[in-house]
């Protein structure tokens, strides 16, 4: 299902009609060293990696009915965002992801896109996490703005810290007990 915000269209990758344009955007964003200044080792080196990622994300939508969206702003794919089913230390959770073109950063687009994706996934009732490199300060800042908080006891590695979305409704219930 396509999501719309005031400025954005979020298109599930399996519903994106122009597969070549989708692959091009994946490659351009994920091979841009500016996108991975915090972790240069993660930069895509071959276009085949973008094709593999596209196929994996398409499969997520087809098999699990949830996944990442291509984020369109003014008719251009400016990034990717959403949640997908993920197993973290044996627990089924939703992993939150966002990656945007450098020219699209700093405009509130990632916040708007991720918020829409989280809102659309709220009915699933699963815990949402974000795995973030501590050196990626813009990503940490965005996660905190969205309500995610550090959960050091669940860290994957020193390079991959876990943030958990705090649910005020659950906290209120816990405080009443």
For each feature predicted by the language model, list its residue ranges:
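Acyl-donor (CoA/ACP) binding surface of acyl/acetyltransferases
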Residues: 1-37, 68-177
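Conserved GNAT-fold acetyl-CoA-binding loop/helix
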Residues: 34-56
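Short, conserved alpha-helical segments within structured domains
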Residues: 42-49, 67-70, 135
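A generic structural signal for short
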Residues: 46, 60, 127-128
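Short secondary-structure capping micro-motifs at structural edges
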Residues: 55-58, 83
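A short helix-loop-beta-strand connector motif used in the catalytic cores of GNAT acetyltransferases and
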Residues: 57-69
